[in-house]
Structure formats: C-alpha cells, structure tokens
Amino acid sequence: MKKTLLTSLFVITVALCSAAEPYFRATWVSTVANIDFPSKAAIGNYEQQKADMIAMLDEFQKMNLNAIVYQVRPTADALYPSELEPWSHWLTGKQGEAATYDPLEFVCTEAHKRGIDVHVWINPYRVTLPAMNIEDLAPNHMYHKHPEW
C-alpha cells in the first residue's frame, strides 16, 4: 500500500512538473487583395515590402504571438518562386513578373529571429476574384493551363 502510494505520488509529481506545451498564439497574414501584406503602396517596391513585414513581425512579437499563418497562394499564384504557379500580382503588380527576393524565405528568416513560427496558407480552389481581369492573368496561370477545369 505504501509503495503504491509513493509510486502514485511520484507519477503525479512528474506529470505536474512536465513542461506544458506552449499555446498557439497566432494571426493570419492575408495577401489576397493586399489585405495585410504587402500594402498597396508597396506593390513592386521590395525594400518597402521587407520593411513593412519587419514592422508587422515586430508588432506580433510585442503581442507575444508565437506563430503566423502566412498566405502564399492567394489566387492560383505564388508569393514564392514556383515552377507550377506564376508570381502573384498582389506582390509584383503584374502576375508572372518575378520578384527580386523570395518573400517566403524572408518571412521565415525574420519570423524565426523573433521566435515566431510560420505556417503557410494556400487557397487551393480560388482561381480569380471578380475584380480581376482575365486578360491580365499570366500565360502559365491555371485558368489558361487547364481551361477544362
């Protein structure tokens, strides 16, 4: 009986002293229609985009967030170098036009400096938005590659 009680007490003590998993304190960073990033004023201005992202991450760090959910595929286009999808016009101003930096790599590097994890968010079904002009879609956009869809 005494041995069982001591064993139970030991197990309970170890369980209570174990480090708890940190809470997931995150925010979404939406890129479609330039809701959060990049600002409309920074489209095509990559140094301004970097400065804006650093300011956002600094603010998230002050808010004690430990993760962001970063939208990297808003309208069948990409905010990272991709062989499958064109560059996003929300980033460059013209769909298919390459940025001079890798925004996803930049976000990951800067977020990790602040102890913030990055989770990517893709929209697998959204091809365009009503306000988008079909003629402005890049030749390698899904709309042109798979019209049967």
Q: Where is each model-derived feature located?
A:
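Sec-dependent N-terminal signal peptides
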Residues: 4-14
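Aromatic- and glycine-enriched glycan-recognition loops and surfaces
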Residues: 43-63, 90-114
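Mature N-terminal, pre-catalytic/accessory segment of carbohydrate-active enzymes
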Residues: 19-66, 70
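Aromatic-lined carbohydrate-binding/catalytic grooves of carbohydrate-active enzymes
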Residues: 63-99
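Active-site-adjacent "subsite" loops/lids of carbohydrate-active enzymes
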Residues: 30, 34-51, 125-149
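Substrate-binding cleft and catalytic face of glycoside hydrolase catalytic domains
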Residues: 71-79, 106-143
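Flexible loop residues that form catalytic
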Residues: 9, 32, 73
